[in-house]
């Protein structure tokens, strides 16, 4: 029979004699092996996880969720008397509107409420509501039996308008904006100084400017500056795109603008940023077809909210556009937009600063001549310089390197600035600004 294993793979009796006996691991060796690969806090973390599992098990046992098919607590835990008392004390209310207050200064005032599509009633207040909480025109909650006023309700605002409010501040700061030093100073005078030092304006007897128009070619940092302002102030920030206010049905856009400012007045201080305002703020004209009538109604409502019969309050308004020549003169007048800030192309110092800002978060070699790169990018916007830095990183990735070199930046300048010049609309937009 042929030996398929071979002599080198087959054990002999002499080899078996030389083999050492296999010793079983004791408990100490097993405990030592278990500690391999564990961090300093592994034991504490495991202990906390076990405690959490025990608490969850105890909670489920008390509520009886696992034992019940319906997910209800077991009947032994029911409190029917307390549930009935809760139902009697907390009954569903009907929404109405208080249209007038009769004998408001007396001890027993009466309130005229209007229940929509039903009737009008003269009612009293319940014991839980103070007379100072109710005002004329306010939405209130009334019971279905005596129609007494139980709670005051906040104003009705469209959920689409409420969702425009930004809860988290943008992560852009003034140090992330390059080539706009003068523009940032003008913005801070209008937005930050009235909020932080209002006594300066009171002593002089003037009202601070409340509206700013940011205009300039695309990519010069208008929206970036607005995000930096929102990061610096503690005011509520509401960004609005102009095209969001262009609605299909008549009156919808004007209603959204009205509710937007109504929500802003409820805040202590508010900053509203209208981006691409030329979508609704164009000059009025009659084309004969009436296609732009709804857009013009939206703009008229915006004009009224900016400087109309009702005071604007502590609301700052920023607007950004690439085409200031198309805006309506009524929107541009002082009192509505007090300050116009032009964002022009950055100079040599600004372009160098923009290169350093974008290279700050990149892995680049030392001693890159950013001023030389800035000289090779004349008449370039901040967005184009950012594209140069991104392309330099792509060249480094293509060459399988971990850092970007100056040669990568030079090749990126040739690709973005020189090759893409035919796609640039900056010269055409410079004639509009």
Swiss-Prot record:
<dbReference type="GO" id="GO:0017025">
    <property type="term" value="F:TBP-class protein binding"/>
</dbReference>
<comment type="subunit">
    <text>Component of the 19S proteasome regulatory particle complex. The 26S proteasome consists of a 20S core particle (CP) and two 19S regulatory subunits (RP). The regulatory particle is made of a lid composed of 9 subunits, a base containing 6 ATPases including PSMC2 and few additional components. Interacts with NDC80 and SQSTM1. Interacts with PAAF1. Interacts with TRIM5.</text>
</comment>
<dbReference type="GO" id="GO:0043161">
    <property type="term" value="P:proteasome-mediated ubiquitin-dependent protein catabolic process"/>
</dbReference>
<dbReference type="GO" id="GO:0036402">
    <property type="term" value="F:proteasome-activating activity"/>
</dbReference>
<dbReference type="InterPro" id="IPR041569">
    <property type="entry name" value="AAA_lid_3"/>
</dbReference>
<dbReference type="InterPro" id="IPR050221">
    <property type="entry name" value="26S_Proteasome_ATPase"/>
</dbReference>
<dbReference type="GO" id="GO:0000932">
    <property type="term" value="C:P-body"/>
</dbReference>
<keyword id="KW-0007">Acetylation</keyword>
<keyword id="KW-0067">ATP-binding</keyword>
<comment type="function">
    <text>Component of the 26S proteasome, a multiprotein complex involved in the ATP-dependent degradation of ubiquitinated proteins. This complex plays a key role in the maintenance of protein homeostasis by removing misfolded or damaged proteins, which could impair cellular functions, and by removing proteins whose functions are no longer required. Therefore, the proteasome participates in numerous cellular processes, including cell cycle progression, apoptosis, or DNA damage repair.</text>
</comment>
<feature type="binding site">
    <location>
        <begin position="216"/>
        <end position="223"/>
    </location>
    <ligand>
        <name>ATP</name>
    </ligand>
</feature>
<dbReference type="Pfam" id="PF17862">
    <property type="entry name" value="AAA_lid_3"/>
</dbReference>
<dbReference type="GO" id="GO:0140296">
    <property type="term" value="F:general transcription initiation factor binding"/>
</dbReference>
<keyword id="KW-0832">Ubl conjugation</keyword>
<keyword id="KW-0647">Proteasome</keyword>
<dbReference type="InterPro" id="IPR012340">
    <property type="entry name" value="NA-bd_OB-fold"/>
</dbReference>
<dbReference type="GO" id="GO:0005524">
    <property type="term" value="F:ATP binding"/>
</dbReference>
<dbReference type="GO" id="GO:0000502">
    <property type="term" value="C:proteasome complex"/>
</dbReference>
<feature type="modified residue" description="N6-acetyllysine">
    <location>
        <position position="116"/>
    </location>
</feature>
<keyword id="KW-0597">Phosphoprotein</keyword>
<dbReference type="InterPro" id="IPR048723">
    <property type="entry name" value="PRS7-like_OB"/>
</dbReference>
<dbReference type="InterPro" id="IPR003959">
    <property type="entry name" value="ATPase_AAA_core"/>
</dbReference>
<dbReference type="Pfam" id="PF21236">
    <property type="entry name" value="PRS7_OB"/>
</dbReference>
<keyword id="KW-0547">Nucleotide-binding</keyword>
<feature type="region of interest" description="Disordered">
    <location>
        <begin position="1"/>
        <end position="22"/>
    </location>
</feature>
<feature type="compositionally biased region" description="Basic and acidic residues">
    <location>
        <begin position="8"/>
        <end position="22"/>
    </location>
</feature>
<dbReference type="GO" id="GO:0016887">
    <property type="term" value="F:ATP hydrolysis activity"/>
</dbReference>
<dbReference type="GO" id="GO:0008540">
    <property type="term" value="C:proteasome regulatory particle, base subcomplex"/>
</dbReference>
<dbReference type="GO" id="GO:0006511">
    <property type="term" value="P:ubiquitin-dependent protein catabolic process"/>
</dbReference>
<comment type="similarity">
    <text>Belongs to the AAA ATPase family.</text>
</comment>
<dbReference type="InterPro" id="IPR003960">
    <property type="entry name" value="ATPase_AAA_CS"/>
</dbReference>
<protein>
    <recommendedName>
        <fullName>26S proteasome regulatory subunit 7</fullName>
    </recommendedName>
</protein>
<dbReference type="InterPro" id="IPR027417">
    <property type="entry name" value="P-loop_NTPase"/>
</dbReference>
<dbReference type="Pfam" id="PF00004">
    <property type="entry name" value="AAA"/>
</dbReference>
<dbReference type="InterPro" id="IPR003593">
    <property type="entry name" value="AAA+_ATPase"/>
</dbReference>
<feature type="modified residue" description="N6-acetyllysine">
    <location>
        <position position="422"/>
    </location>
</feature>
<keyword id="KW-0963">Cytoplasm</keyword>
<dbReference type="GO" id="GO:0022624">
    <property type="term" value="C:proteasome accessory complex"/>
</dbReference>
């Amino acid at each position: 029979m042929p030996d398929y294993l071979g002599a080198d793979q087959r054990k002999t009796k002499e080899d078996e004699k030389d083999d050492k006996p296999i010793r079983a691991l004791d408990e100490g060796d097993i405990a030592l092996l278990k500690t391999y690969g564990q961090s300093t806090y592994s034991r504490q973390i495991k202990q906390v996880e076990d405690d959490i599992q025990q608490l969850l098990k105890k909670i489920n046992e008390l509520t009886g969720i696992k034992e019940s098919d319906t997910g209800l607590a077991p009947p032994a835990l029911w409190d029917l008397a307390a549930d009935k008392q809760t139902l009697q004390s907390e009954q569903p209310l009907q929404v109405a509107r208080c249209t007038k207050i009769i004998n408001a200064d007396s001890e027993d005032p009466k309130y005229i409420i209007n229940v929509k599509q039903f009737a009008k009633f003269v009612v009293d207040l319940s014991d839980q509501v103070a007379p100072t909480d109710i005002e004329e025109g306010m939405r209130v909650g009334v019971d279905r039996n005596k129609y007494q006023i139980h709670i005051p309700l906040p104003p009705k605002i469209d959920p689409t308008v409420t969702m425009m409010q930004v809860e988290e501040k943008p992560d852009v700061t003034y140090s992330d904006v390059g080539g706009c030093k003068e523009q940032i100073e003008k913005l801070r005078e209008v937005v930050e100084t009235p909020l932080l030092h209002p006594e300066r304006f009171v002593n002089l007897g003037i009202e601070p400017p409340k509206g700013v128009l940011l205009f300039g070619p695309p990519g010069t940092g208008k929206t970036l500056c607005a995000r930096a302002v929102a990061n610096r102030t503690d005011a509520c920030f509401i960004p609005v795109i102009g095209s969001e206010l262009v609605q299909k049905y008549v009156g919808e856009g004007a209603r959204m603008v009205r509710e937007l400012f109504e929500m802003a007045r409820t805040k202590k201080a508010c900053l509203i940023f209208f981006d691409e305002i030329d979508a609704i703020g164009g000059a009025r004209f009659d084309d004969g077809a009436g296609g732009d009538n709804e857009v013009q109604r939206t703009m008229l409502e915006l004009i009224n909210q900016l400087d109309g019969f009702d005071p604007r309050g502590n609301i700052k308004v920023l607007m950004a556009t690439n085409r200031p020549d198309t805006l309506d003169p009524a929107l541009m007048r002082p009192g509505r937009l007090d300050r116009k800030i032009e964002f022009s192309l950055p100079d040599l110092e600004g372009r160098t600063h923009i290169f350093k800002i974008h290279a700050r978060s990149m892995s680049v070699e030392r001693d890159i001549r950013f001023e030389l790169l800035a000289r090779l990018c004349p008449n370039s916007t901040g967005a184009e310089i950012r594209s140069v830095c991104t392309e330099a990183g792509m060249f480094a990735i293509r060459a399988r390197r971990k850092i970007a070199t100056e040669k990568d930046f030079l090749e990126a300048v040739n690709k973005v600035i020189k090759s893409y010049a035919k796609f640039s609309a900056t010269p055409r937009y410079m004639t509009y600004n």
